[in-house]
């Protein structure tokens, strides 16, 4: 396996296409530029990738277990099936990212920008989304059991009565929405057993009794 060096996008993608294997685990990749890279299936376990730019990258089935992703840019990245178990992604940019079926168990997404991110069928059990910005995010059929969304902001930013956040068919058992702004959110057919909505703004929300 090759250890990551300063390969250009073209060099890396050519090597990957030829079948070369890379090893990103435990590497120091602070503020590295991975824009547009095909990193599908790669292993970043326990790597330090704080502040790295993955915007537009293909991260399908990529492993980030134990990695440091604080302040990284994952906007427009495809993270379908990626594994992020028990790591911190605080203050990370995840705008328009795709997390379909991803494993984000116990991940810290506090203060992250999740605008229009797609978490459909993702596992967010025990995840921390404290003060995260979730307008337009899709959590359909996701598992947010005991997730903490305290002070999460799903406001529709002046877009009228459009749905701000989608929680359709998701499992929200025991989730904490204290002080969250969920105006116009859609909770249709979601499981909300033992959810905490103390002082949450649920104006015009659907599916909440």
Segments predicted by a language model, with ranges:
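Tandem repeat scaffolds
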Residues: 2-209
